[in-house]
């Protein structure tokens, strides 16, 4: 199975550096890394170029012009470049625990998509890691919040099989994985969602509508989220999402750019 790791980013190269550092030391190196870039400046391009020189797998850069928050289209651009059978998504402010890709590979199963959680880092720790260019963090590190999400205990995952079963839209796009063929069936991400919010819930909903089930990667696929101020949800995206909850494909998605 070939795995493509897609990392979303926008003008935060100091955080992307740590994400790429964590990708480089995975126990299971992805077969390729694709940066879904929503219009970053030249310093991000230079960072990616420098990492690509000695990275253990190919790094591809899917860049689009900066015309506001267009995460859905950015991810579709990255998918257009993907060669993997299985796609793992994170954001460019994520540090992956070293078993992250191996965990997602182990959890991959036909008929399912996988969502995980994340531990959060306080601002002071985030600034320290960025300044020192280090990724050595764990459950025990001071400044880690939501520590229950930093516990790597994969033998306990089966105990959480029914966790959040009734919460249809539980999950985060910063830690999700699915088969590429399933993404094609629903036409990828909905590019009509412009502005922050609902890209992931919309995708989950359409995956459910084609008959997929969800796995929850509790105690596996551990990741740490670097601190930043929260963005405001775009109310227009919410209205667009709620307008048709039964649809299986989006009108403007992956197909339009293939």
Residue locations for each model-derived region?
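Cell-envelope/extracellular polymer assembly enzymes that use nucleotide-activated donors
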Residues: 2-4, 32, 202
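Acidic helix N-cap motif at the loop->helix transition within catalytic regions
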Residues: 17, 42-50, 99
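Short, acidic, metal-binding catalytic loop of nucleotide-sugar glycosyltransferases
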Residues: 21-30
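A conserved acidic beta->alpha catalytic loop
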Residues: 29, 37-48, 68, 94
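Glycine-rich, basic loop-to-helix element that forms the pyrophosphate-binding segment
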Residues: 65-82, 99
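Short aromatic/hydrophobic "clamp" motif used to bind/position activated sugar donors
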Residues: 87
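Conserved donor NDP-sugar-binding/catalytic core segment of glycosyltransferases
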Residues: 99-140
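A short, conserved alpha-helix in the catalytic core of glycosyltransferases
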Residues: 171, 175-187, 194-213, 218
């Amino acid at each position: 199975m070939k795995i493509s790791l897609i990392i979303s980013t926008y003008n935060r190269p100091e955080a992307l550096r740590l994400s790429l550092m964590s990708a480089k030391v995975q126990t299971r190196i992805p077969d390729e890394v694709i940066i879904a870039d929503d219009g970053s400046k030249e310093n991000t391009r230079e960072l990616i170029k420098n990492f690509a020189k000695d990275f253990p797998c190919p790094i591809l850069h899917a860049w689009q012009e900066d015309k506001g928050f267009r995460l859905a289209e950015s991810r579709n651009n990255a998918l257009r470049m993907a060669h993997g059978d299985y796609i793992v998504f994170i954001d460019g402010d994520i540090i992956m625990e070293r078993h992250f890709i191996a965990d997602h590979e182990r959890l991959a199963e036909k008929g399912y998509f996988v969502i995980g959680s994340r531990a959060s880092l306080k601002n002071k720790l985030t600034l320290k890691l960025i300044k020192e260019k280090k990724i050595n963090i764990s459950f025990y590190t001071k400044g880690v919040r939501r520590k229950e999400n930093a516990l790597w205990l994969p033998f306990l995952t089966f105990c959480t099989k029914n966790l959040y079963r009734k919460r249809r839209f539980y999950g985060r796009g910063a830690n999700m994985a699915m088969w590429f063929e399933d993404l094609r069936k629903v036409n990828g991400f909905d590019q009509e969602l412009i502005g922050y919010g609902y890209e992931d819930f919309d995708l989950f909903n359409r995956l459910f509508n084609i008959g997929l089930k969800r796995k929850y990667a509790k105690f596996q696929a551990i990741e740490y989220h670097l601190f930043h101020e929260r963005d405001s949800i775009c109310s227009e995206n919410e209205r667009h999402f709620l307008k048709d909850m039964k649809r299986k494909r989006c009108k403007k998605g992956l197909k339009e750019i293939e």
